[in-house]
């Protein structure tokens, strides 16, 4: 048996080797078989079966699908009627959860943003060495259309990027390669090179990192002795207070107390 077969009045789904399609976990699995979309449970029992037809919307397993006239699933960006949609590789319309949610995706040399219904609401060409405004953010790519990441200099100004997007939302200390930097509104305000097992002073705070065997800098976390003093760090930053107040922190089954 292969695909959907009826046994004793019940429809089951079988793999190509004749084995009943069962699994140990709860939930519903889906498959395509003989131009049908099929969903089945962990016992291999068919829950839903919908015939695949070309050039029409198909509702299956509470999702929408679209196939061309040769019954190939739509993938990526496609225009149907007066609207443009984004589809996953299996032909499923890429809905994004809840109303008001916007998801972005790169297809070739374009960026697309689609809403919770899968409808494309914005698109922009990706060009190199030029600021691109998209979905409320700013992006930058090099001449090979590779997105900027980490600290980059544009027109003499240092910026910080996350996968091509200017990190305008940050107001914190970040890492970029061998550099520790304070970033605000996407710009690098202050920076310092990492030092192995040496205190680093940045933006009014003190940091402590070490170089691991893989060649990456990692923050100290917890109590460590530096220059004969017992200091307490959380993710690399020395913990201090603005007064003589004693502060505490519970970590790794220990309660630590520290002052300014």
Language-model features: locations:
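Extracellular adhesion/carbohydrate-binding repeat motifs centered on closely spaced tryptophans
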Residues: 1-260
């Amino acid at each position: 048996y292969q695909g959907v077969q009826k046994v004793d009045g019940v429809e089951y789904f079988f793999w190509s080797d004749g084995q009943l399609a069962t699994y140990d976990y709860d939930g519903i699995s889906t498959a395509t078989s003989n131009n049908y979309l099929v969903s089945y449970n962990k016992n291999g029992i068919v829950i839903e079966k919908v015939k695949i037809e070309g050039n029409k919307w198909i509702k299956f397993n509470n999702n929408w699908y679209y196939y061309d006239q040769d019954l190939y699933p739509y993938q990526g960006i496609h225009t149907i009627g007066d609207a443009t949609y984004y589809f996953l590789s299996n032909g499923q319309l890429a809905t994004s959860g809840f109303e008001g949610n916007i998801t972005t995706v790169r297809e070739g040399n374009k960026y697309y943003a689609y809403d919770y219904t899968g409808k494309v609401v914005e698109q922009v060409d990706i060009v190199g060495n030029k600021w691109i405004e998209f979905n409320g953010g700013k992006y930058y790519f090099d001449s090979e259309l590779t997105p900027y990441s980490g600290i980059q200099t544009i027109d003499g100004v240092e910026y910080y990027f996350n996968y091509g997007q200017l990190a305008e939302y940050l107001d914190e200390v970040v890492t970029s390669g061998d550099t520790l930097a304070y970033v605000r509104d996407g710009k690098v305000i202050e920076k310092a090179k990492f030092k192995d097992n040496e205190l680093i002073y940045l933006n009014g705070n003190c940091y402590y990192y070490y170089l691991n065997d893989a060649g990456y800098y990692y923050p100290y976390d917890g109590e460590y002795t530096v220059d004969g003093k017992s200091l307490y760090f959380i993710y690399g930053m020395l913990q201090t207070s603005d007064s003589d107040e004693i502060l505490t922190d519970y970590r790794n089954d220990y309660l630590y107390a520290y002052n300014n």
